């Protein structure tokens, strides 16, 4: 899952690597010995992108973009942060699949910096730092 304003960076990186425009939500691209399976879809009302590739340089380039998923308050706008609780149901699925791979790679110091840089409620800051 990717923030909507970061999708263009991802697409540009892929298009540059494979010298082709992404024109649909599902695509397979090949260039020399590199192959990419690209699938863009909606989940939890947000854009998700599934990428399978054997191109290590592309993986490194995507990793260097420091893409991040949308915040829980964006994905679940009609829920009070206090109802997120112990990560059950759809919140647990979203957390495990989309948020934790991003959040888990940050040190505690970087997590603290992240929540301070965002315009988050105190409850959301506390929730994110609690689920370290």
Predicted regions and their residues:
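Polar/charged low-complexity regulatory segments
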Residues: 1-132
């Amino acid at each position: 899952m990717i923030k909507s304003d970061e999708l263009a960076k991802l697409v540009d990186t892929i298009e540059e690597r494979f010298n082709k425009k992404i024109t649909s939500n599902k695509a397979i691209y090949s260039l020399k010995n590199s192959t990419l399976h690209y699938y863009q879809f909606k989940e939890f009302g947000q854009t998700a992108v599934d990428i399978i590739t054997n191109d290590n340089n592309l993986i490194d380039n995507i990793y260097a973009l420091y893409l991040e998923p949308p915040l829980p308050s964006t994905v679940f706008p009609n829920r009070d942060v206090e109802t997120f609780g112990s990560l059950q149901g759809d919140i647990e699925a979203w957390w495990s699949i989309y948020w934790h791979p991003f959040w888990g790679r940050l040190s505690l110091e970087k997590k603290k910096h992240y929540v301070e840089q965002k315009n988050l409620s105190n409850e959301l800051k506390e929730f994110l730092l609690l689920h370290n």
